[in-house]
Amino acid sequence: MPTITHNGVKLAYDSRGKGRPAFVFIHGWTCDRSFFAPQAKHFARRHRVVSLDLRGHGQSDKPQGPYPISAYVDDIAFLISTLRLGKVVAVGHSMGGITALQLGADHPDKVAGIVMVDPAPLIWPPELNAGVGAIVAAIEAGDQKPRRQFIADALFMKTSDKALVKRVLKVMMASPSHVAANAMKGILAFDGPAAAARCKVPALHLAATPPLNPPHLMTQWLPNVVNGWTVGAGHFNMMEVPDQVNSMIGAFLRHYV
């Protein structure tokens, strides 16, 4: 397992394949780089593919303190430069989706295009904001039940594969409490419309069922966005229906990047 160190934090990643543009896969809140395995395998046939464990996640270091989206962006920009990847296609899920958006806004010289796979809300509806805030408070108080219930009930369809739900829960619930709480605070503090207003690189949004960001609002915030919508999958659509996701990313790459 290769690593790089940025600002004292060791970051684990996998690298495979050859070809430009390179892909960087960015997982979501309390997940790890394995969640994009179906996409990494598919695109490594013709492209260099790098899958990263964000700080606080997977096999990367898990420092105390805040976890703003900007910290992930700085880490990824450092990784792109260090590995000499050129201009990449940044593919992010959930928290990783808004990280890809901010990366495209801050570093257009390093980004050929972004793919946001059911990204975290660019604007949080008040009721959802309050509910997630209560989950953060519960985590900090040592109560993990609301966190588990949120993952199992809100992020999957009733028809989702039970083995996949179990696997996702196992990884996400293993995340240390300080990371889970502070990373979610970073998500809630993110100014999505501001990032969207500054992001001028080609962008693809892949909505799930139900979408965290309705496509018509994504078009309003990010006029250059291409909207797609997976069928028969909840929030983890890149794992539930990988062929659909791979096909749409491939079409985006051919026609827009």
Task: Tell me the role of every PLM-derived stretch.
Residues 202-239, 244:
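Conserved loop-alpha-helix segment in the C-terminal half of the alpha/beta-hydrolase fold
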Residues 124-130, 141-197:
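Conserved alpha/beta-hydrolase catalytic His-Asp/Glu region
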Residues 1-10:
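N-terminal cap/lid segment of alpha/beta-hydrolase-fold proteins
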